[in-house]
Amino acid sequence: MNLLVLALLVSCFLASYLARGLKVLPVYFVLLPELLAGVALLIVLSRLVVGKRPQLDGRYLLFIGLLVLTMAMGIVAQRVPAGAVVSGLRDYIPMLSFLLLGAAYPFTSRQIKAQLVVIGVLLLVQVPTAVYQRFFSFAHKMHTGDVVTGTTTNSGTLSVVMVSGVTVLTVLYLRRRIALMPLLVLTGFMLVPTMLNETKATFVMLPIAMLAPIFFMRRSEKPFRRLIPLVAVFAVAGVAFVGVYNAMIQHRNPDSSLQEFWFEGGVLNYVYKGSLEGDERVGRVDSVQIALREISQSPLRAVFGLGIGNVSPAQLPGFDGEYSHYYRAYKISFTQITMLLWNLGYMGIVVYGLLFYAIFRDAVLLARGAGKDAMLGQIWAPIVMIAAMCMFYKAVLTDQEFIYPFMFYAGVVGRRAHLLRQERRALKRSQAPAAERGWGPASVLARQ
């Protein structure tokens, strides 16, 4: 089973890059992650047949049920073409397969450690790849960092996964698994791609990655003793990022800087163009406003959206949605919030809000526990925070490099949190009969 997960991780990061980027594999290899998702679904179903159901809290099952219901209602209400339905399901069914796989199979700590090592290697590969793309492969496009994608789908996704890797390094330091100097060197190395592709959101993600893990440890472990060195590393990384970003941006706008973007009104102009007031440009906030305006034309649209796949173009004829011409015109792929509103309506926001709440709740439960899963929970809680923040930044839930591993480990965390709750309930039940038989402190005093 672990080989399937390792194959998934490798294929998510490399299949599309090798097939479409380098063109050293047949183009059909881009479907490998989805094929593995199908295998995962068959494994989950086979375990259900023999009575081994996924160990998950009811909130996850509610999420799956509401998601399926919302998709079905949107398809029926908007009469989505069959081809568009098939195209749309590709964004949802595979991720559910990996959520259930993580919850259904009892992966050992050793297996998860092997998986994290593979992820670490894949993240390290992104650094030389990003350097090559920026200074060699796309040297003629020095005016933009968008071409620096590593082996991932786009530059934004690359930055999200690299900053998530910094979260792992931070937790390893707080847990005394690595020393300060390796943390400093590896953090700087991991952030190189985010500097080269000029991801401004790193300025928001990095504090979460490096500072939030402190608040998900038990007080008895005295995490704040390592706060000052950690803040020092964060400051060095931040200064380095600003310096490199300002040097890179000179190729596009010599008068621009990161400080100007964040503190002198640049961020507002970046996310909001005023398209509803007549500007032809569409920013991230504009894309959400347009989605809200369009789906509010009828109650069914508002609740369930225009239906999955109905606003997305396709490479094959017959798979385009009825409103696929909206995709580029209204920048539907700008943010995940925008995509959810178009595809699933307000229910999409509610459904995924429930998912993020359930994952975060379970991660915190593990992190503040005393068991061997505490480190896993401590890693996962900040990553969930980063993912939630990125809902307003990128359409991260449709990028395989992020969403497939994210949902798999959500299942792993959910399973372990569910078992921890069962263990605690069993302990309470075992203590209750002793108190009823008169062994509790109150009954002893009463007999005296």
Report residues per predicted region.
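N-terminal signal-anchor transmembrane segment
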Residues: M1-V49, L69-A77, T129, G440
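Loop-to-helix entry and N-terminal half of a specific, functionally important transmembrane alpha helix
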Residues: L4-F13, K331-T335, W342, G353, ...
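Interfacial loop-to-transmembrane-helix boundary motif in multi-pass membrane proteins
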Residues: L4-V5, Q55-L67, L101-P128
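Aromatic-anchored transmembrane helix interface
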Residues: V30-A40, G58-M71, P81-A104
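Alpha-helical transmembrane segments of multi-pass inner-membrane proteins
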Residues: K113-H140, T152-R219
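Long extracytoplasmic/lumenal interhelical loops at the membrane interface
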Residues: H140, G278-L344, A363-R368
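Transmembrane alpha-helices of multi-pass inner-membrane enzymes
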Residues: V168-L169, L355, D362, I379-P441
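A membrane-periplasm/extracellular boundary helix in multi-pass inner-membrane enzymes
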Residues: L196, M217-G274, S296-Q297, A446-R447
